[in-house]
Amino acid sequence: MAELHVEIVAVERELWSGDATFVFTRTTAGEIGILPRHIPLVAQLVDDAMVRVEREGEDDLRIAVDGGFLSVTEEAVRILVENAELESEIDADAAKQDSESDDERTAAWGRARLRALGQLD
C-alpha cells in the first residue's frame, strides 16, 4: 500500500515522524482525511484538534494538538503546532479538568487531549 511521510512538530520538540497510510484531523474549514498523493494544500487546524495517524500493521497514533497548521504535498504531511501530546502522555484527569475551564484556550487544550484519548467526539 502507498504511504506518505508524516512529521508532527511542536514548538519545543518533534513529536513524531514516520510513514503512514492515512492522516485525519480537523481544520477551520472542516474535517480532512489525507491519503498518499493528496493534492497539495495548507490549512489551519482548529484549537482543539486531534490528529489520527494510521500506519500499516501498527496501532493508530492519536495526538492532541493545540492549533497550528497542516501542510500537504503528494508525498508528505507536515503538522506544525504550538503544543502537542501523544495519547500515551496524556493525564486524563488533568485533561477533563482543563476542558471545564473558563479560559477558552485552556478548555480547548483539554478537549483536544480528551479527543486523543477517545473520550470526546
From Swiss-Prot:
> What is one term from the GO cellular component aspect held by the record?
plasma membrane
Top-rank lineage group of the source organism: Bacteria
For whether the record's keyword set contains Iron, the answer is no
Q: Which CDD domains does this entry report, sorted A to Z?
A: F1-ATPase_delta
InterPro entries, per database record: ATP_synth_F1_dsu/esu, ATP_synth_F1_dsu/esu_N, ATPsynth_dsu/esu_N
Q: Which residues belong to the signal peptide in this entry?
A: none
Localization per Swiss-Prot or TrEMBL: Cell membrane
For whether the record's keyword set contains Membrane, the answer is yes
- Which Gene Ontology molecular-function terms are recorded? ATP binding; proton-transporting ATP synthase activity, rotational mechanism
Annotated membrane topology is: Peripheral membrane protein
Q: Which UniProt keywords apply?
A: ATP synthesis, Cell membrane, CF(1), Hydrogen ion transport, Ion transport, Membrane, Transport
* Similarity-based family: Belongs to the ATPase epsilon chain family.
Q: Quote the function comment for this protein.
A: Produces ATP from ADP in the presence of a proton gradient across the membrane.
Oligomeric state and interaction partners are given as: F-type ATPases have 2 components, CF(1) - the catalytic core - and CF(0) - the membrane proton channel. CF(1) has five subunits: alpha(3), beta(3), gamma(1), delta(1), epsilon(1). CF(0) has three main subunits: a, b and c.
Please identify the protein, giving its name as recorded. Answer: ATP synthase epsilon chain
